[in-house]
């Protein structure tokens, strides 16, 4: 846990694809800006150009290019190694510090009895660090007598340009729910309705009035339903906007903790550029 005064950030959950942070004391707008930046501004690698030299399969050229673009590529090293998307705008694919070559060439003998499924693992990529995260992803079926030859190029891009570059399949911000309760108004019907929330039932059975902070409770729709029906007047659900849960689920292109780190870095750079723009305009003193 990292603490600064009344503010703290705690890693509640972390694995290869998911990170959940408990954030206290920071403004909602600031944390939400990080959440949005995760989806729209953190760069990853994805195929952007595809040249189809030969394709006699049943899959249209446009569909081949589309499927290649959706292949999730490992971008953990690429984000530090290759030039940023805006620096590569208008550049030719031959620019090695902007693009990675991705090629596919396959043919099945006409005399063969069965065809072959081409997967993401069959792609030849010029940079071994930019490899398919899910190599078993099926791309094309090549039947006997068919062939395909594609040369493609991947580059860094951002989710706001196309979702194939978004590093996260999920980026959610949740408030911490607080339950205000009055045991004197809670009948048997109310307790039965709340049976899925043993912590709440225990508080109501203890007697008296009070509040209960439900940290870690992600879904409160059932709780709100009970509050509005069987427990009307006995319980009320509120939310603490200063105690937040930020959950990010990676597509696999980047480690989840790196996604959050890069989102904060991107946000800092935006603020810096904005401050420089304001300074360049100048502010007249009154």
Curated annotation (Swiss-Prot):
SUPFAM superfamilies associated with the record: Insert subdomain of RNA polymerase alpha subunit, RBP11-like subunits of RNA polymerase
UniProt GO BP: DNA-templated transcription
Subcellular location: Cytoplasm
Enzyme Commission code(s) on record: 2.7.7.6
Spans through the membrane: none
Enzymatic reactions: RNA(n) + a ribonucleoside 5'-triphosphate = RNA(n+1) + diphosphate
Example of a GO MF term: DNA binding
Predominant location: cytoplasm
UniProt xrefs under InterPro entries: DNA-dir_RNA_pol_30-40kDasu_CS, DNA-dir_RNA_pol_insert, DNA-dir_RNA_pol_RpoA/D/Rpb3, RBP11-like, RNAP_Rpo3/Rpb3/RPAC1, RNApol_insert_sf, Rpo3/RPB3_RNA_Pol_subunit
Annotated Pfam families: RNA_pol_A_bac, RNA_pol_L
Function, in words: DNA-dependent RNA polymerase (RNAP) catalyzes the transcription of DNA into RNA using the four ribonucleoside triphosphates as substrates.
Family label: Belongs to the archaeal Rpo3/eukaryotic RPB3 RNA polymerase subunit family.
Name of protein: DNA-directed RNA polymerase subunit Rpo3
Taxonomic path: Archaea, Thermoproteota, Thermoprotei, Desulfurococcales, Desulfurococcaceae
Name of the gene this protein is made from: rpo3
């Amino acid at each position: 846990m990292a603490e600064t005064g009344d503010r703290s950030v705690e890693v509640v959950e972390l694995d290869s694809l998911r990170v959940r942070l408990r954030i206290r004391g920071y403004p909602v707008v600031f944390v939400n800006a990080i959440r949005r930046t995760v989806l729209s501004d953190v760069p990853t690698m994805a195929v952007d150009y595809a040249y189809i030299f030969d394709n006699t399969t049943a899959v249209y050229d446009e569909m081949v290019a589309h499927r290649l673009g959706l292949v999730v590529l490992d971008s953990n090293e690429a984000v530090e190694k290759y030039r940023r998307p805006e620096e590569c705008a208008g550049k030719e694919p031959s620019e090695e510090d902007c693009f990675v070559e991705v090629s596919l060439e396959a043919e099945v003998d006409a005399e063969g009895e069965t065809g072959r499924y081409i997967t993401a693992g069959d792609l030849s990529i010029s940079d071994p660090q930019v490899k398919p995260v899910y190599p078993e992803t099926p791309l094309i079926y090549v039947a006997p007598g068919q062939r395909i030859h594609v040369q493609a190029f991947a580059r860094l891009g951002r989710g706001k340009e196309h979702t194939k570059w978004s590093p996260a399949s999920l980026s959610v911000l949740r408030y911490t729910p607080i339950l205000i309760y009055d045991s004197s108004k809670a009948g048997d019907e109310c307790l039965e309705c709340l049976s899925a929330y043993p912590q709440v039932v225990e508080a109501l059975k203890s007697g008296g009035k009070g509040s209960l902070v439900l940290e870690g409770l992600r879904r409160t729709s059932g709780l709100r339903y009970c509050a509005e029906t069987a427990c009307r007047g006995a319980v009320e659900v509120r939310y603490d906007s200063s105690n937040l849960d930020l959950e990010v689920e990676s597509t696999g292109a980047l480690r989840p903790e790196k996604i959050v780190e890069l989102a904060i870095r991107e946000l800092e750079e935006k603020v810096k550029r904005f401050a420089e723009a304001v300074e360049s305009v100048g502010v007249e003193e009154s």
